[in-house]
Amino acid sequence: MITSIELIDKFDLKFIAGNVAIEIPVANADISRPGLEMAGFFSHYSSDRIQILGTTEMSFFETLSKEERAERMVKLCRKETPCIILTRNIPAPQELIDACNRKGTPLLQSKEATTSLISKITSYLESELAPETTMHGVLVDVYGVGVLITGDSGVGKSETALELVKRGHRLVADDNVEIKEVSRNVLMGKAPKLIEHLLEIRGLGIINVMTLFGAGSVLPEKRLMLNINLETWNKDKVYDRIGLIEEKLSILDSQITKKTIPVRPGRNLAVIIEVAAMNYRLNKMGTNTAKDFNERQNEQIRRQSIKEI
């Protein structure tokens, strides 16, 4: 739960009036600039949002009569309003101080410009209030691609991650990956604090990757882009040999590209994942080798058919 106290510490805000001890939760990442409300229109007032008062709002406020000022500020302060913030160190008018003290709404002050403060608070709230879940797997940064390695227990996820780290890539999380959906199809993954930088290898135990390989071998968080699902080789299953099958892994309300890699003795999984990551980047740049091959093959078949006719 995010409250005004956390915002004070995070954004260097100054407490002016109200009751900061009242823990009114910030449940909405959107920020409101109550311009129409200053003019007296409260029909669609988003009272559950953080209210930001800048130079424009306060300049208009100065044109109001004394009675109108008091009335507008009382209406602005609601029990569900997390806080009201004055930007650019604008002095708080007495009407606003009285209304905040009466209703208990925290009144804060910032030295930052209005647009800059709104941008920073919005980014922070979107990250903190984003839907989240946890998944069993390993998250590794491979050539700048966030690769989530999944599969049954004992299939070799951690061992593969260790080989990738040894080859110069960076570990984000092992065994338990905390995932947040910061926006549509944008998933950020990180490790729980308890197991940050740790890797569990059967027969060896728990190792600290940062201590063994250095600070450059770990990453605090990474966007999930590609899922590599490891599974024991099944001779009765037909695996994709060309690359035309487009699988997707759904996490929360987002999807990422998925590749299923069969595991059997002699396969170098680390190299395969490296190539998968590079191929993913190549596809995003507009080059799809599988589709190009398929088109050339179809063209050759078409030409052969014409010759036979």
UniProtKB/Swiss-Prot annotation:
Residue span of region Important for the catalytic mechanism of dephosphorylation? 262-267
For this UniProt entry, the molecular function terms from Gene Ontology, in alphabetical order, are: ATP binding; magnesium ion binding; phosphorelay sensor kinase activity; protein serine/threonine kinase activity; protein serine/threonine/tyrosine kinase activity
Q: List the keywords (alphabetical).
A: ATP-binding, Carbohydrate metabolism, Kinase, Magnesium, Metal-binding, Multifunctional enzyme, Nucleotide-binding, Serine/threonine-protein kinase, Transferase
Q: Could you tell me the EC number(s) of this protein?
A: 2.7.11.-, 2.7.4.-
> So what does this thing catalyse?
[HPr protein]-L-serine + ATP = [HPr protein]-O-phospho-L-serine + ADP + H(+); [HPr protein]-O-phospho-L-serine + phosphate + H(+) = [HPr protein]-L-serine + diphosphate
Cofactor(s) required, per the database record: Mg(2+)
Q: Any keyword Kinase?
A: yes
Question: InterPro entries, per this entry?
Answer: HPr(Ser)_kin/Pase (IPR003755), Hpr_kin/Pase_C (IPR011104), Hpr_kin/Pase_Hpr_N (IPR011126), P-loop_NTPase (IPR027417), Ser_kin/Pase_Hpr-like_N_sf (IPR028979)
Q: Which residues form the active site?
A: H136, K157, D175 (proton acceptor), R241
Q: Domain of life here?
A: Bacteria
Q: Where does ATP bind?
A: G151, D152, S153, G154, V155, G156, K157, S158
Specify where the region named Important for the catalytic mechanism of both phosphorylation and dephosphorylation lies, as residue ranges: 199-208
Write down the top EC class of this protein.
transferase
Give GO terms for biological process: regulation of carbohydrate metabolic process
Q: Does the keyword Kinase apply?
A: yes
Cite the binding residues for Mg(2+): S158, E200
Q: How does it assemble?
A: Homohexamer.
Domain remarks in the Swiss-Prot or TrEMBL record: The Walker A ATP-binding motif also binds Pi and PPi.
Say what the protein does.
Answer: Catalyzes the ATP- as well as the pyrophosphate-dependent phosphorylation of a specific serine residue in HPr, a phosphocarrier protein of the phosphoenolpyruvate-dependent sugar phosphotransferase system (PTS). HprK/P also catalyzes the pyrophosphate-producing, inorganic phosphate-dependent dephosphorylation (phosphorolysis) of seryl-phosphorylated HPr (P-Ser-HPr).
The family annotation for this protein states: Belongs to the HPrK/P family.
Its UniProt miscellaneous note says: Both phosphorylation and phosphorolysis are carried out by the same active site and suggest a common mechanism for both reactions.
NCBIfam families linked to this entry = hpr-ser
The protein's name in its UniProt record: HPr kinase/phosphorylase
Gene assigned in the entry: hprK
